[in-house]
From Swiss-Prot:
It is found in: Cytoplasm. IleRS has two distinct active sites: one for aminoacylation and one for editing. The misactivated valine is translocated from the active site to the editing site, which sterically excludes the correctly activated isoleucine. The single editing site contains two valyl binding pockets, one specific for each substrate (Val-AMP or Val-tRNA(Ile)). This is Isoleucine--tRNA ligase. GO terms for cellular component: cytosol. Monomer. It comes from Sulfurimonas denitrificans (strain ATCC 33889 / DSM 1251). A motif ('KMSKS' region) lies at residues 610-614. It holds the Pfam family Anticodon_1. The keyword Glycoprotein does not apply. Its EC number is 6.1.1.5.
Length: 919
């Protein structure tokens, strides 16, 4: 007789294959239709809040795998907090101003020259259209990743109200007394003709001259030092093109300097290394303290101009000569020491990186007309030649040098009139400097990982004043009026408020398209003719750095609370968004804009190499979605250690897909097993094995939830996978098959196991829902009503872990016994003595086994019997805590229905199966 139809085999309509590629877009469309984000807000009304403030991606180009990593990670974090019962806010945003968009518009127009023929207002119109196009494109690409956010109300930095709030933040910084305008050397991109902030600087290798130049001491200086022979300070530089602008030579105030027998002056500590490298030769003729040189003069060998000798703490004696060429127009340290000694700031380089008329007017270079309009980098060789024998040594070398992040051309330091936020001034209302406020707030902030704290602290501690002005077209203008007669900038509050109101109504384009009469507050006290507009625009990092004000503090968005609970970005944002946001919030609010900062690494290929089209190792999100679906990408994010760089490749994605398949099939078998469950068995009536798995699940799920709450997803996923593979699938689902398939439908043992599985499904479902949201939502449709409880979708659930089940099950003892049993079983199978464990029985005097329900003990080992009778034919034995377990073949016949060896003969069913069949 075929007993298959009498078995309660698992059944469910939940598919083995997710068909993610086709099903995900359909499910997301249904979420859109149901306005799931709004539903999430309603479901957690009055609950504890959680605000993730989105760092805005740039509205230029399609999203790449780094964008996908970032947005998925944010989405997982937000959803974890949601399913933990919190009221979450996740308002996505876009950075819309700045150089990259301008460059794209230039390309469309056919180059810079054609762009320069257009009015600024027209250029800005084209930039605005370009950014708007990619906001829409990227929004759809992010939604395809399963990200749920306030997509209908994103923040876009070029929106009129947003631009007005960026401007208001600028005005607030000015009111705090931190905004200054001054001529100061800044990173300058001659290719893009604009100043850059530190965050816009990248370092690449560059070949440069290494040149040692002798500056003769003036006769007066030699007389004061009692030197009767040739004497020249030797400076070392890698930028010969800055020698025309030299006005000083800096020495270390704590060092001794020597005059060599060959007539050169260098730091005493460096003489031996200079001699060894054959840059100099000679012995010590005289020794001096640095202080003796202060304010004496040397002569520039290029143009004969005097160069004042000054003392500066910035001078190091680890390499070079200890005598530092100082050109205040071309370096931050040079500028600072120049302020102390009132050195002239000479700036002979124009915005394109070419020498201007200053070299002719001030006689900075012999035959200056030959250099006029010539690019500085093309002038080095000729300048070296002009200095003749004063060049002591010259060579070439490669070193790391600052480059423009967009054009990848080498930058220069160039003194120009710019707007700065002073980080070492005290904002009005504070007794601390802006830098000190920021450093103090860094200490109060949570960091994930903790190493981020020192990284941000170091950057805050060492950064110079923030240059916030740019000489470009597309950005929020530094919309101040300047009085023509005096140069004074109008910072009257009513004037500033009026300008902000105009921007809110017409956008910041109004600064360029509207006449001064319409932009000026009527009671300003000046006529339009008496004023001129400041034409610089704001650094785009100011835009994004002020989003805490425009998004969290304004009433324009339902975006959560200030301070945000978390900022999440790549590790490069310590020098970017984390820092710019900190300084602006510290300036205006005197505190950080965030309570926590999470940083992740970058995406690399499986060899750890950076992705590039030339290498052919780029993994595009679109490609992954077409081949696997977003759930596989989301599982990859959650299973990767984001603290370092994240490897991704076809083979890694295949492994992620395999892990997804295992997880899905674990849910499928449990759903199939609980398909006919109508009531949950109370804990006190559950079997020992069911209590055991519930306690194991509770312990693991607690650990997973704790890891997820600390944003340690890789650890949480590891705990979860180990539990699913080992305890859940490896043991429990296997040992309950007999009861679930062969017992009567409503048998207490069967419904107990079903109840345990149902509770695990429900808790596990909300645990993985933040990561595999599509799958979790699909599973809800196949839950028995006893745990679905009429809920519409996954978003109606809140994570609640399983309760502790009071149990006498000795886990360590039973694990040890099972492990030793299966070691022997493996040998028996290899020797073909048995095919499966149901052919076996165990004979033991173990008290712990005797205390267990006999059937539960049999199920634990998946054997046909456990007894205390005499051993008939021993196949193997093992010992646990002094108790002997003997394995032997079952003597009863195999039941044709359940396959246990408990029947009287092979034609009859066992007692249990007979009862079920007769019922």
């Amino acid at each position: 007789m075929d007993y298959k139809d009498t078995l309660l085999l698992p059944t469910t309509k939940f598919e083995m294959r997710g068909n993610l590629i086709n099903n995900e877009p359909i499910r997301y469309a249904s979420w859109d239709e149901k306005k799931i984000y709004e539903k999430m807000k309603k479901n957690r009304k009055n609950a504890q809040s959680f605000t993730l403030h989105d760092g805005p991606p740039y509205a230029n180009g399609h999203t790449h795998i780094g964008h996908a990593l970032n947005k998925i990670l944010k989405d997982i974090i937000v959803k974890h907090n949601y399913f933990s019962g919190k009221s979450v806010r996740f308002t996505p945003g876009w950075d819309c101003h700045g150089l990259p968009i301008e460059q794209q518009v230039e390309k469309k127009l056919g180059g810079k020259q054609k762009k320069e023929l257009l009015e600024k207002a027209k250029i800005r119109e084209l930039c605005r259209a370009h950014a708007a196009e990619f906001v829409d494109i990227q929004r759809e690409e992010f939604k395809k990743l399963g990200v749920i956010a306030d997509w209908e109300n994103p923040y876009v930095t070029m929106d009129f109200k947003f631009e007005a709030n960026i401007y208001r933040t600028l005005c607030n910084v000015a009111k705090k007394g931190l905004l200054i305008e001054r001529s100061k050397p800044v990173f300058w991109s001659w290719a893009e003709r604009t100043a850059l902030a530190e965050a816009e600087v990248e370092y690449e290798d560059k070949e440069d001259y290494s040149i040692f130049i002798a500056f003769e001491l003036s006769d007066e200086a030699k007389a004061k030092l009692s030197i009767n022979s040739k004497a020249a300070l030797v400076i070392w530089t890698t930028t010969p093109w800055t020698i025309p602008a030299n006005t000083g030579i800096s020495l270390n105030p704590e060092e001794e300097y020597i005059l060599t027998t060959t007539g050169y002056i260098v730091a005493k500590k460096l003489l031996s290394s200079l001699n060894e490298s054959k840059i100099l030769s000679g012995d010590i003729a005289q020794t001096f303290k640095a202080k003796e040189f202060e304010n004496l003069l040397a002569l520039n060998p290029l143009n004969g101009r005097t160069s004042r000798i000054v003392l500066g703490e910035h001078v190091l004696v680890e390499n070079g000569t200890g005598c530092v060429h100082t050109a205040p127009g071309h370096g931050e340290d040079d500028y600072r020491i120049g302020l102390v000694y009132d050195l002239e700031v000479v700036m002979p380089v124009d915005e394109t990186g070419c020498y201007d008329e200053t070299i002719v007017r001030d006689g900075l270079i012999p035959n200056a007309e030959d250099f006029l309009g010539r690019h500085i980098f093309k002038s080095n060789e000729d300048l070296i030649t002009l200095m003749g024998e004063s060049v002591v040594h010259v060579s070439k070398f490669k070193h790391s040098y600052p480059h423009c992040w967009r054009s990848h051309t080498p930058l220069i330091f160039r003194a120009t009139k710019q707007w700065f936020i002073s980080v070492d001034e005290k904002p009005s209302g504070s007794d601390k400097t802006l830098r000190d406020i920021a450093l103090s707030e860094v200490e109060k902030t949570l960091f994930f990982p903790e190493t981020g704290r020192n990284r941000l602290k170091s950057m805050v501690a060492n950064r110079p004043d923030w240059c916030i002005s740019r000489q470009r077209d597309w950005g929020v203008p530094i919309a101040f009026f300047r009085v023509k007669a005096t140069g004074e900038v109008l910072l009257d509050e009513k004037v500033l408020n009026f300008t902000a109101m105009v921007f809110e109504m017409h956008g910041s384009d109004a600064w360029y398209s509207m006449p001064t009469e319409q932009l000026l507050y009527p009671g300003a006290g000046y006529s339009a003719d008496e004023l001129e507009k400041v034409t610089d625009i704001l650094d785009v990092w100011f835009d994004s750095g002020s989003t805490w004000y425009s998004v969290l503090k304004s009433r324009n968005y339902d975006a959560g609370e200030f301070q945000a609970d978390l900022y999440v970005e790549g590790s490069d944002q310590h020098r970017g968004w984390f820092q710019s946001s900190m300084f602006l919030s510290a300036a205006v609010e005197h505190k950080a804009p965030y309570k926590g900062v999470l940083t992740h690494g970058f995406t690399v290929d499986e060899k750890g190499e950076k992705m590039s089209k030339s290498k052919g190792n780029v993994v595009a999100p679109e490609t992954v979605l077409k081949e696997y679906g977003s759930e596989i990408l989301r599982l990859w994010v959650a299973s990767s250690d984001y603290q370092g760089d994240l490897k991704i490749s076809q083979s890694i994605l295949k492994q992620s897909a395999e892990n997804y398949r295992k997880l899905r099939n674990t849910f499928r078998i449990m759903l199939a097993n609980i398909n006919d469950l109508h009531a949950l068995t109370p804990y006190e009536k559950m079997g020992e094995l069911d209590k055991w798995i519930l306690n194991e699940a509770k312990s693991v799920f607690d650990g997973v939830h704790k890891s997820f709450s600390n944003y340690n997803f890789v650890n949480g996923m590891s705990l979860l996978n180990n539990f699913i593979v080992n305890e859940l699938s490896g043991i429990y689902i296997d040992i309950t098959k007999d009861s679930l398939y062969c017992d009567a439908k409503d048998d207490a043992r069967r419904t107990s196991s079903q109840s345990a599985m149902a509770l695990i499904v429900k808790s596990l479902l909300t645990l993985i829902a933040p990561i595999l949201t599509y799958t979790a939502d699909e599973i809800v449709e196949y839950l028995p009503e006893v745990i679905r409880e009429s809920k519409e979708d996954i978003f109606d659930f809140v994570h609640k872990n399983i309760d502790v089940a009071e149990s006498g099950f000795n886990t360590d003892y039973m694990y040890a016994a099972r492990e030793k049993f299966y070691e022997i079983v493996d040998g028996l199978k290899k020797e073909k003595i048995i095919k499966n464990t149901l052919e076996l029985v165990i004979v033991t005097e173990s008290k712990k086994i005797a205390e267990m329900d006999k059937t539960a003990a049999e199920d634990w080992f998946v054997v046909s019997g456990i007894s205390h009778s005499e051993v008939i034919a021993e196949l193997g034995k093992f010992e646990v805590d002094g108790s002997i377990f003997v394995i032997q073949k079952a003597t009863a016949a195999k039941c044709p229905r359940c396959w246990k060896y408990q029947a009287k003969d092979e034609t009859a069913t066992c007692t249990r199966c007979s009862k079920v069949l007769n019922a």
